[in-house]
A protein has these predicted regions:
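Acidic, divalent-metal-coordinating active-site segment for phosphoryl/phosphodiester hydrolysis
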Residues: 127-140, 162-163
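Phosphate/pyrophosphate-binding loops at sites that engage ATP/ADP/AMP, CoA/4′-phosphopantetheine
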Residues: 56-66, 140, 144-146
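PRPP-dependent phosphoribosyltransferase catalytic core
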Residues: 2-14, 141-189
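Short glycine-rich phosphate-binding loop at a beta-alpha junction
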Residues: 63-74, 151-154
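Short, glycine/charge-rich flexible loops or terminal/linker lids adjacent to PRPP-binding catalytic cores
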Residues: 79-124, 134-137
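Active-site-facing substrate-recognition patch
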Residues: 1-63
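Solvent-exposed alpha-helices and their adjacent loops that cap or buttress functional pockets
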Residues: 29, 114-119, 146, 166-167
Length: 189
């Protein structure tokens, strides 16, 4: 088994153990679901954070980017683990976080961390779970409005509910570590 395959196997086990729930849930998209992956639980777990950072860095290693970002709160631990491990790997990526609403005081900005970037810098956007792609697109627009170029979008989980297609229509190819089918099958074993 390759190193990447072993890392994915370990992360899948943690996601199923820590983040998978069955029940009646309303998703950020407004849709109802009989299962839910709260990836924040895994992303805030020491091993989970390390695995996510390693795997995202592996996905991004061939891209000419200056940093990674995502919508707060779900992307906060993803950005942190990815940036910290990028430095350890000798390819430092800076982080940025997109607010759902501007601060309303101070600089009144939607995007935090811009001081580490120059206008036109290329970045990748990170997301925990993609359902319709709406939250990720909102974050992408705010980052573009701030003057940065988005060259990749990555997620831990693609729920396979149209998000990949929506993102593609907007010019973004989704790089997901897992699909819903992969993780739900594993969870129900």
């Amino acid at each position: 088994m390759s190193d990447r395959a072993e890392l994915k196997r370990r992360l899948a086990r943690l996601l199923v153990e820590k983040s998978y729930r069955e029940g009646d849930f309303v998703l950020a998209s407004g849709r109802r679901s009989d299962y839910y992956f709260d990836c924040r639980v895994t992303a805030l777990h020491a091993e989970g954070s390390w695995l996510i950072g390693r795997l995202f860095n592996d996905v991004l290693k061939e891209l000419d980017i200056r940093g990674v970002g995502g919508m707060t709160l779900g992307a906060d631990p993803l950005v942190s683990s990815t940036t910290a491990l990028s430095h350890e790997q000798g390819r430092p990526l800076h982080g940025l976080l997109v607010r759902k609403e501007s601060k309303g005081h101070g600089t009144n900005q939607f995007v935090e961390g811009l001081g580490n970037f120059q206008p036109g810098d290329a970045v990748a956007m990170l997301e925990d779970v993609v359902t319709t792609g709406g939250s990720l697109l909102k974050a992408c627009r705010r980052v573009q409005d701030a003057g940065l170029r988005i060259v990749a979008v990555c997620a831990i989980l693609d729920r396979e509910e149209g998000g990949r297609e929506t993102l593609k229509k907007e010019g973004y190819e989704l790089h997901a570590l897992f699909t819903r089918k992969e993780l739900v099958e594993l969870a129900r074993r």
